[in-house]
Amino acid sequence: MTNTISIKLLNCLARGVQSLGDEARQRVTAFVESQLSAGGGFCDKSGRRDIYYTSFGMLLALVLGIKLNTMRMDDYLQQIDADDLDLVHYAAYKRCCMLNHLAKSKVGFAVKALQREPIRELTSFTAYPNNDMLSPYSQFIIYSLLEDTNNPTPQVALSSYRTADGYTNTPNGQAASTNATAAALMIKGQSEGYDNTEAILLRNMQHECGGFKAEPSTPMPDLLSTATALFTLSCYNVTPQYSASEFIEAHWLDSGGFAATILDSESDVEYTFYGLLALGAL
């Protein structure tokens, strides 16, 4: 049985944590703890509690050994109107519910995977990434949501998003993007098996500095695109063309968190997640 995307992410994050020395781990842990809201949940860059950021924070807390107050987290989750969320935030909400349930019940993912959770009808969402329910990124979010809640995963048709160089989030688009290609490859890997010849397109997108650009026209590589690409390549057991170690380290800030690009001076739990994910995928 193939591990879910969430389990693969956690395993990769754990490897990222294991790659840190004691001092580095303490700095990252302190930063993640600083992003916790007193009332439960994690904050965005502006300091406001946010369910999207909370999903990253809870995954980080799990691999860093940060003990969360599950009662406060329950209170926070119960305040959220799940029926009013868009797809991305709803998937984050359901992942948070799953992680908090696991923390309270002390059961593993294998036991949790036996339990099916009801979810909203997928057609009930009015907002999708790229305004397209069928794009690779939207389908990746849906696939992960269905896995997390142990609901049947569908066959996904992505041929209209395929280009000569990879995948795009626009039907019949011309320029492949890193994140659309990584999303498409993760869906194909989960549903059809991880054939490493499929990942060569993604491998070819790497910049010689070690990072990946979001799109060919983007001025510079960023940490999110790099982490998602490296994670996907690791799932396919494909080695990147260039070492990404120095690129990742350049995004680690004195605060203990990671920045989106080398031009950014602030961090949050989302990009700290991507920093550790990238390290774990090396």
Regions found by a protein language model. Give the residues of each.
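Long, well-ordered core segments of solenoidal/helical folds
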Residues: 21-40, 68-85, 106-129, 148-169, ...
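An alpha-helical repeat/solenoid feature that recognizes helix-turn-helix modules
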Residues: 2-21, 45-67, 83-108, 127-153, ...
